[in-house]
Design a protein with these regions (language model features):
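Short, structured secondary-structure boundary patches
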Residues: 14, 39-40, 72-74
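TPR/TPR-like (Sel1-like) alpha-helical repeat modules
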Residues: 22-32, 36-66
Length: 80
């Protein structure tokens, strides 16, 4: 489901991506990849509270991940 959410996001099918993402969360724990996708999805929809929650989780649980580095770049560039 996470892969389908990512593919949908990459194809700019954001509603489908959110659907797959939330179905994924019903059955799985967050990974760096799921937190990153959650940040992107929620940032796109303007949900600042969820973005902030996912940012805290990503930085706290996976500070050395590729996704945390992507987050830092996004924050440094002012995109988040």
């Amino acid at each position: 489901l996470l892969a389908m959410a990512q593919i949908s996001f990459d194809n700019q099918k954001y509603a489908a991506s959110r659907k797959y993402f939330y179905q994924y969360l019903e059955n799985a724990r967050h990974t760096p990849a799921s937190l990153w996708l959650g940040i992107l999805l929620e940032n796109r929809s303007g949900n600042k509270n969820r973005v902030a929650s996912y940012v805290v989780l990503l930085k706290g649980k996976y500070p050395d991940s590729v996704e945390a580095a992507l987050l830092k770049k996004m924050q440094d560039s002012g995109q988040l």
